[in-house]
Amino acid sequence: MKVEKRKIDTESIKKFWVGLLEGSGSIQVNHWKKKNLQFRLEIKLKNCNENFLMFKDIQKAIGGYIRFETSKKKERDQVVWIVDQKTEIERIIKIFDQYALLTKQKQDQLNFLKENLQRQDVNWYLKERDNKYKVRVAHPDYKIKDITYFNEWLSGFVEAEGCFCIRTSTYHSFSISQKYEKVLLSQIKEFFNITTQIKESKKNIFLLEVYKKVILQKLIHHFIEYPLLGEKNKSFERFKNFF
């Protein structure tokens, strides 16, 4: 299967970053001693060279800084991309005006951040912080086929949430899961003409898993043309060699 790889330019990285943020990131509003509000965009991934280099590309294209953390459980070290300066956050979130967030959770986080940036009121924040997912604002309806940046977005999202599984039985598979986002998984299912049913693996955690070879080949074609940029690309490279 020969497909020419796309050049990863700044705009492609922005689109990829939106998907990556939706899968493994967070849009945060916090407080310091109930006196001042603090704002933060963050993506945490396993600490490895591939993820570090991906974050360097994101840093160059978008901004932010990178640091390394040891998890509290000491299960693994993490590499973290962070933006925590208010003016830089205000600049970066304008990217979402062009490449909108697709998951309801991140849309709610962004709306809460914007409201607090405007209000700058610690008391309001303390009162409303537990309600940011309860008070639902009207989210735009969309069809993936109408989203011009979806291909790069999906690669970013899969970098965070996708899994390429190689089995000795030769029943290899690709899966992706997300909490609450059944509608989004349904759109991905439709985009690739997947016939497999979406399963609820745990409470409010939905799973889409694909075994069918013709669909897996279609997915492989996608990730060659719109490449994964971090550690997930290693598992993809091993996976595609079986087809």
From Swiss-Prot:
SUPFAM superfamilies: Homing endonucleases. One of its GO terms (molecular function) is endonuclease activity. Keywords: Endonuclease, Hydrolase, Intron homing, Mitochondrion, Nuclease. It comes from the Eukaryota. It is found in: Mitochondrion. Gene3D superfamilies: Homing endonucleases. It is an enzyme of class 3 (hydrolase). Mitochondrial DNA endonuclease involved in intron homing. This is Probable intron-encoded endonuclease aI3. It comes from Dictyostelium citrinum. The gene is aI3.
